[in-house]
Amino acid sequence: MVKIKELLAIVKSSVIVMVIVILIVGVIIPTVTSFIAENVDRGSANGSQINLDGKIYGSYLLAQAFNQSYFFQPRPSAINFNQTSSGAPECAPNTNASLNETSQNIKEFERMNPNVTLSQIPGVMIMDSDSGLDPNIPVQGAIIQEKRVVQSIINLGNIKGIRLSLHEVNSTVNQLINSSESQDFPIFGSYYVNVMYLDVGIINFLVNHNILSKSSLD
């Protein structure tokens, strides 16, 4: 039989090992990882927050509803971009309900972009994302919205009594698209842009040109 002293020694060793593992896995590794993340990529470590004039307006990782015509539109959302929730449509893809929903998404996209034909619209632009909060759209999905966005920015400037040149607005929007372009998988992946990045860039442009006031962001 195992003696009491031997049993206590085994228990003591087990406790020591457990404490060491807890310290390493639960304290040291998270602390070191957090320290590295904060110093290497502070923005991502904090959830890629959208910071405008010192205030947080969400995250670049979560799509929001930008209903004005001078903003790029994200993919449709079954949860109405409710950031306290997440989810896709409940209906199966081959049901009448799903077909009707897709048809409505097409009509809405064509209403917002009357110069775009159905064949130009990437399929994902008329399909709800799995989370309902996907901020990424294909590059083509941004390009076909570009004409509407540019003209709407110019029109908004005219309403505010500020004349913007087509060249300046075009260049700004093009630069936003190009600087946001990423590939979801090296070499063979598809190219996409982050709608939140584009629309925050537009907000900054409008604020800098005194077309939108900072107070209107609240």
Task: Kindly give the residue locations of the regions a language model identified.
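Flexible, solvent-exposed loop/hinge segments and secondary-structure transition points
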Residues: G26, T33-Q145, V149-S152, L156-I162, ...
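Active-site oxyanion-binding pockets that recognize sulfate/phosphate
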Residues: V17-M18, A88, A92, F188
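Extracytoplasmic/periplasmic C-terminal soluble domains
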Residues: R148-D218
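Solvent-exposed aromatic/hydrophobic patches embedded in short alpha-helical segments
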Residues: L23, V27-I28, G141, Y197-L198
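Internal alpha-helical transmembrane segments
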Residues: K5-G43
